[in-house]
């Protein structure tokens, strides 16, 4: 894998055909802001007017790029009302601040369906913006057969790992109700089920939660995460619905091949361009996941 590292970097640079359009906007406009779609949901639900920069309140001309959780706020089996709340927030925002040019960035063009027609859209994978200096190959002894860096949400499908056998799996996650990852819209039932699954995983010695110390979640720096990646043979992406999936590129830059289950939202399109560096479209089946882990371990 190390011998082909620069080939991988070239692939990552070429994977986003619309990056030139994005960077042209960056270079030719002096005032820009970056946010995620859930900002507008919160703006509508919780009226976060105090978080709007004064320069926007003064109605100065500027561009807001909104990206990130675009797939998540569309109606899906996990969040049936978030898309509607987000759209309402966007409509109110652009009405109150008419000098704002709001551009929505999507890694999968199919997800522009249902957003206000007055907005601009850019088919853009935000993984193109990752700091490539933070993740790289370093000489570390392998300690884990695979690693899964993922917040503890239902769509991340941690349950797929429960029956894993004879493999050491490193986990990095912040529980949905931890002080590092609070989400007011998560139902208590989902939180309780998440804690039960977390408990079962941690009782199994095959799993190591890297960002927990003395029973509390701790923040990991990019340097620490990169070191943990380099101590693993492969990186897991198990969500069934997800957009760009930032950790997939972190894995790749750290020299890890990616193991991905069937996915809707953009990650599958990205990883299929990675050739030998990714196994995609696995069924939600532990046997297939284990076979992929063994393949890259060899």
PLM regions: where:
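Extended catalytic core of nucleotide-activated donor transferases of GT-like folds
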Residues: 1-102, 106-114
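Short hydrophobic beta-strand element within catalytic cores of glycosyltransferases
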Residues: 257-261
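Short alpha-helical segment that forms part of, or immediately flanks, the ligand-binding pocket
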Residues: 226, 248-253, 267-268
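Acidic donor-binding loop of glycosyltransferase active sites
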Residues: 148, 227-243
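Short acidic alpha-helix that forms the nucleotide-activated donor recognition element
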Residues: 217-232, 253
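Conserved catalytic-core segment of nucleotide-activated headgroup transferases in glycan assembly
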Residues: 45-46, 73-91, 98, 107-114, ...
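Short glycine/proline-enriched, acidic/aromatic patches that form the donor-sugar handling elements
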Residues: 244-245, 262-270
């Amino acid at each position: 894998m190390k011998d082909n590292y620069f080939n991988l970097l070239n692939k990552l640079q070429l994977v986003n055909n619309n990056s030139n359009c994005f960077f042209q906007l960056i270079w030719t406009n002096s005032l820009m802001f970056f946010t995620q779609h859930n900002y507008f949901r919160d703006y509508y639900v919780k009226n976060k007017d105090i978080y709007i920069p004064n320069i926007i309140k003064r109605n100065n001309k500027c561009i807001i790029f909104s990206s990130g959780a675009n797939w998540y706020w569309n109606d899906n089996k996990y969040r049936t009302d978030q898309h509607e709340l987000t759209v309402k927030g966007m409509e109110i925002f652009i009405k109150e601040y008419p000098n704002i040019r709001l551009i929505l960035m999507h890694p999968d063009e199919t997800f522009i369906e249902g957003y206000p027609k007055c907005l601009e859209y850019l088919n853009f994978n935000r993984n193109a913006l990752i700091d490539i200096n933070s993740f790289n190959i370093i000489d570390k002894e392998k300690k884990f057969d695979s690693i899964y860096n993922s917040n503890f949400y239902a769509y991340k499908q941690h349950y797929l790992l429960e029956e894993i056998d004879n493999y050491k799996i490193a986990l990095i996650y912040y529980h949905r109700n931890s002080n590092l990852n609070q989400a007011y819209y998560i139902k208590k039932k989902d939180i309780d089920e998440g804690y039960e699954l977390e408990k079962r995983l941690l009782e199994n010695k095959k799993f190591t939660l890297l960002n927990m110390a003395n029973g509390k979640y701790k923040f990991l720096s990019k340097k620490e995460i990169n070191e943990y990646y380099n101590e693993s043979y492969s990186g897991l992406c198990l969500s069934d619905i997800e957009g760009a999936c930032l950790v997939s590129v972190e894995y790749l830059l750290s020299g890890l091949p990616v193991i991905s289950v069937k996915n809707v939202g953009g990650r599958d399109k990205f990883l299929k361009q990675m050739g030998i560096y990714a196994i995609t479209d696995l069924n939600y089946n532990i046997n297939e996941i284990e076979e992929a882990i063994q393949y890259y371990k060899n």
